[in-house]
């Protein structure tokens, strides 16, 4: 998104706000389309194997993105962004469902908090690194190399994930993404505590995404700043999320 905001907008002759929102939409769209299907796959197959498979696909996607960066093929970068959104959609249920299998009930809240904190800090580190790379000579080459390197490191790390038994190996997967999504929503609605918890969580991310998507343009057009201003504002959000995650165990008293 930083590349689209500070480099691609002028070359493509498009408004920064349009590019920002288009990029955000392409990344989020797979969550709406494939989340229910991803949950079924996470229940049917062993999670460490699935993680390694997804991380291999991530390397392929990052190679595609690197090609788009180096040759400045911006439509290809949009395709890679959609594919990374799809990657995150299928990886999400795996990583969040792994903890209940690996942790006891008393450990779960704290583990979830640490998990979310780690995610926030990783995002923060990535944003800071992106800002540094954008200031270097030939930034697109650096970005290409770093993204592929990080994807490879992610795959290597996935090889150390302990094997866990698949919860529902006999599950028959319904590949109709619209039917499965509707059925999932209907089932959640019958469980008020789950329904309202998910609504609250979804509202938080909806509210955050609405504002965070506008940060690059706000920094560039209103504050007249560069990438460092964007990173500072996004850092505040990430740090807040990380601190809140740490407080989860204390606030909930493991309930």
Model-derived regions: residue spans:
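Helix-loop boundary and gating motifs at the non-cytosolic
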Residues: 1-29, 190-237
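Transmembrane alpha-helix termini and helix-breaking/packing motifs in multi-pass membrane transporters
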Residues: 2-14, 66-71, 123-147, 221-222, ...
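Helix-to-loop junctions at the C-terminal end of transmembrane segments
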Residues: 32-46, 134, 243-255
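C-terminal ends and interior cores of transmembrane alpha-helices
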Residues: 56-72
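Hydrophobic core of transmembrane alpha-helices in multi-pass small-molecule transporters
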Residues: 61, 74-90, 202-203
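Cytoplasmic helix-loop-helix junction between adjacent transmembrane helices
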Residues: 80-121
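Helix-loop junctions on the cytosolic side of multi-pass membrane transporters
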Residues: 97, 101-102, 144-173, 254
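Juxtamembrane intracellular "pre-TM" segments in multi-pass secondary transporters
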Residues: 163-199
């Amino acid at each position: 998104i930083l590349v689209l905001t500070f480099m691609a907008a002028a070359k493509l002759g498009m408004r920064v706000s349009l590019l920002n929102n288009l990029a955000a939409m392409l990344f989020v769209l797979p969550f709406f389309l494939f989340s229910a299907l991803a949950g079924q796959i996470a229940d049917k197959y062993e999670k460490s194997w699935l993680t390694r498979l997804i991380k291999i696909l991530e390397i392929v996607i990052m190679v595609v993105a690197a090609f788009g960066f180096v040759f400045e093929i911006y439509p290809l970068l949009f395709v890679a962004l959609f594919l990374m959104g799809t990657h995150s959609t299928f990886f999400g249920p795996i990583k969040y469902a792994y903890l209940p299998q690996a942790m006891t009930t008393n450990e779960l809240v704290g583990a979830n908090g640490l998990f979310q904190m780690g995610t926030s800090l990783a995002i923060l580190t990535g944003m800071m690194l992106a800002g540094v790379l954008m200031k270097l000579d030939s930034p697109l080459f650096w970005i290409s190399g770093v993204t592929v390197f990080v994807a490879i490191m992610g795959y290597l790390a996935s090889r150390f994930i302990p094997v866990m038994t698949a919860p529902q190996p006999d599950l028959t997967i319904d590949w109709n993404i619209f039917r499965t999504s509707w059925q999932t929503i209907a089932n959640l609605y019958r469980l008020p505590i789950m329904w309202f918890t998910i609504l609250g969580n979804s509202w938080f991310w909806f509210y955050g995404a609405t504002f965070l998507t506008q940060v690059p343009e706000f920094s560039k057009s209103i504050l007249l700043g560069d990438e460092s201003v964007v990173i500072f504002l996004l850092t505040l959000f990430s740090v807040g999320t990380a601190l809140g995650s740490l407080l989860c165990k204390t606030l909930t008293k493991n309930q």
